[in-house]
Amino acid sequence: MKAVLQRVAEARVVVAGETVGRIGQGLLVLVCAERGDSEAQADKLLAKILKLRIFSDDAGKMNRSVQDLDGQGACGGLLVVSQFTLAADASGGNRPSFTGAAPPDVGRRLYDYFVAQARKLHPQVETGQFAADMQVHLVNDGPVTIPLHIAPDA
């Protein structure tokens, strides 16, 4: 499973002119299920995202996670957006291949599972809409952008 995290001051997702998800300070999480992925990869990816220390402490060092933005337990938001294009392979020419992405039914199941688990573990989770044409608006903070990959079990 792949994700790209962007530390944001704020972000929102718009579908057909309607805002469907919005957060203040936190993480925009673009997530993609790949062929061979299961709930195990989703769990590992989510655990990594929630504990990753990419927010600044009082000394300006990246020492805080989205679960503890201020050192006092204040949580930032998670805006989770499905993006199968993270599985793109552009090595063979000028048109990327997406054969590495999970089939749509599996992708939806794993995305829904990831979101459900995130909501169990984190107090503020917003989402886009799976397979929708979305406009993602964000104010990148830093900028800080982190790619993550949890490979399927061998």
Curated annotation (Swiss-Prot):
Its EC number is 3.1.1.96. CDD domains: Dtyr_deacylase (cd00563). Keywords: Cytoplasm, Hydrolase, RNA-binding, tRNA-binding. One of its GO terms (biological process) is D-amino acid catabolic process. It is found in: Cytoplasm. GO terms for cellular component: cytoplasm. Its main location: cytoplasm. The keyword Mitochondrion does not apply. SUPFAM superfamilies: DTD-like (SSF69500). It comes from the Bacteria. The keyword Amino-acid biosynthesis does not apply. A motif (Gly-cisPro motif, important for rejection of L-amino acids) lies at residues 142-143. It holds the Pfam family Tyr_Deacylase. Signal peptide: none annotated. It catalyses: glycyl-tRNA(Ala) + H2O = tRNA(Ala) + glycine + H(+); a D-aminoacyl-tRNA + H2O = a tRNA + a D-alpha-amino acid + H(+). GO terms for molecular function: D-tyrosyl-tRNA(Tyr) deacylase activity; Gly-tRNA(Ala) deacylase activity; Ser(Gly)-tRNA(Ala) hydrolase activity; tRNA binding. An aminoacyl-tRNA editing enzyme that deacylates mischarged D-aminoacyl-tRNAs. Also deacylates mischarged glycyl-tRNA(Ala), protecting cells against glycine mischarging by AlaRS. Acts via tRNA-based rather than protein-based catalysis; rejects L-amino acids rather than detecting D-amino acids in the active site. By recycling D-aminoacyl-tRNA to D-amino acids and free tRNA molecules, this enzyme counteracts the toxicity associated with the formation of D-aminoacyl-tRNA entities in vivo and helps enforce protein L-homochirality. Belongs to the DTD family. A Gly-cisPro motif from one monomer fits into the active site of the other monomer to allow specific chiral rejection of L-amino acids. Homodimer. This is D-aminoacyl-tRNA deacylase. The gene is dtd.
